[in-house]
Amino acid sequence: MTDLTHPLERLVQRAEILMARIEAVLPQPMSAPDWNASIAFRYRKRSNGRGGLEPVRHVATLGLNDLQEIEGQKEKIQRNTEQFVNGLPANNVLLTGARGTGKSSLIKACLNEYAPRGLRLIEVDKDDLTDLPDIIDMVSEQPEKFMIFCDDLSFEDGEPGYKALKSILDGTVAASTPNVLICATSNRRHLLPEYMSENLTYKHTEDGE
């Protein structure tokens, strides 16, 4: 009788090697960082194409009282952030205006103001917005509140990041989670000027908020 033990073992070994190679190239679940390492994190793509959150070691110690001559915008953003950290309905935020008008500083000052109450910030580059569903899925069960921050945002026709962001806000890709707020800044009043009617649904005021 022919002994098939050794050929079968070799076949199993080859199958295991093949599966290991396949798993190496398949997308892996995003691993959570040490949430106690910082109040702010950056999303970064690694050389293998996988993304992850890196803690920001030195967060600017900017406070709301340090920001002058933008009292109207500051009051609205602070009120919206207050509602967010209290678990009440809050609006996603788009701050528009020329460079140097304090848009990013206002977001960072709110972070410092409300970090003791569990507010955290995750900065995501425009090119990585297609990974938003994975980021939201990772933080959805965390007790903290997360502002997902996109700085200096604008799109050209056909960019995948625009559709990804719009899908998140419309709830067509990932269900809205109560501990996630999208905050963005832009030099443009409309993120996609060519199709103003399809722009993201934000509430604008005359002061650019």
Predicted segment positions?
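Alpha-helical scaffold elements adjacent to nucleotide-binding pockets in ATP/GTP-utilizing enzyme cores
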Residues: 106-110, 131, 135, 161-168
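N-terminal pre-Walker A segment at the start of P-loop NTPase domains
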Residues: 59-82
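Conserved catalytic/switch belt of AAA+ P-loop NTPases
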Residues: 140-141, 157-208
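Walker A/P-loop nucleotide-binding motif
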Residues: 87-109
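Phosphate-binding P-loop
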Residues: 56-58, 82-90
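Short loop/turn elements that form and flank the Walker-type P-loop nucleotide-binding site
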Residues: 88-90, 117-118, 141-144, 176-179
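AAA+/P-loop NTPase substrate/partner-engagement loops
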Residues: 113-146, 152-158
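Interdomain "pre-motor" coupling segment immediately N-terminal to P-loop NTPase/helicase cores
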Residues: 2-55
